[in-house]
């Protein structure tokens, strides 16, 4: 209604503008026209900034058939050894072996060992460092040390300090002492009673060859030495004497 009144007022109003034929007359603005129809859609705009990742979706259905097994991996480091298991039951008794005299391989081995042993004894005997009496062998390395050191040397070699238990053994040891021209300790030691001597294993002495008047150390000389003539004398154990071992 307001627009209609305004239009009538403009129509009834006298024209105040005059213009010549040569001039362009400019009138008052007209009534606004009706809106036009929509234009064509515009072009797509530029991509926007990348958004944050969305939440994980639900688990999908299982896939197809399982694939083939992969190749074996490298062998790992050895594990810690386990605890020792219980001892097993004894096995069945085996068949009896051949008698030694029928075992050709054993006989050949024994023959070879015997041959090498005889060779060694022969060589050392020529050097004057070994004497064999019965089942015993007496040997020296030519060194002179105290009694305890001799025991250790002989033990390391698998023997013990030489000690005669018969006249024949005494003569064998005496021959080494004479050749080396050095007294030697024997495998004897004085017991609790002065003048009573025993073998080192504790057994009483069953053979002696004391020098006249010996022993006379009265408990102060606990060891026994052999002279170059084979006679015995009690002596303190700290002197240096020839190493002679028996095997």
UniProtKB/Swiss-Prot annotation:
Pfam families: Lectin_C. Residues 1-15 form the signal peptide. Residues 30-100 are annotated as: Disordered. It comes from the Eukaryota. InterPro entries: C-type_lectin-like, C-type_lectin-like/link_sf, C-type_lectin_CS, Ca-dependent_lectin, Collectin_CTLD, CTDL_fold. GO terms for biological process: respiratory gaseous exchange by respiratory system. Keywords: Calcium, Collagen, Disulfide bond, Extracellular matrix, Gaseous exchange, Glycoprotein, Hydroxylation, Lectin, Metal-binding, Repeat, Secreted, Signal, Surface film. Ca(2+) binds at residues 214, 216, 233-234. Oligomeric complex of 6 set of homotrimers. Belongs to the SFTPA family. This is Pulmonary surfactant-associated protein A. It comes from Oryctolagus cuniculus.
């Amino acid at each position: 209604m307001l627009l209609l009144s305004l239009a009538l007022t403009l129509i009834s109003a006298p024209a105040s503008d005059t213009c010549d034929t040569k001039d362009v007359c400019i009138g008052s603005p007209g009534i606004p026209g009706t809106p036009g129809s929509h234009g064509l859609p515009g072009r797509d705009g530029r991509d926007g900034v990348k958004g944050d990742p969305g939440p994980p979706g639900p688990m999908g259905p299982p896939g197809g058939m399982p694939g083939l097994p992969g190749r074996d991996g490298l062998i790992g480091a050895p594990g810690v050894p386990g605890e020792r298991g219980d001892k097993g039951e004894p096995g069945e008794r085996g068949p009896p072996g051949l008698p030694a005299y029928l075992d050709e391989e054993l006989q050949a081995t024994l023959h070879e060992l015997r041959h090498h042993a005889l060779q060694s004894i022969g060589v050392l005997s020529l050097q004057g460092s070994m004497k064999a009496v019965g089942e015993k062998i007496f040997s020296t390395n030519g060194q002179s040390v105290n009694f305890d050191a001799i025991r250790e040397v002989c033990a390391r070699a698998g023997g013990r300090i030489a000690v005669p238990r018969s006249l024949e053994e005494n003569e064998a040891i005496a021959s080494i002492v004479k050749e080396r021209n050095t007294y030697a300790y024997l495998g004897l030691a004085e017991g609790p009673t002065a003048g009573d001597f025993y073998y080192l294993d504790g057994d009483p002495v069953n053979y002696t060859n004391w020098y006249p008047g010996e022993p006379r150390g009265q408990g102060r000389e606990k060891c026994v030495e052999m002279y170059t003539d084979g006679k015995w004398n009690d002596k303190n154990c700290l002197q240096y004497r020839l190493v002679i071992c028996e095997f």
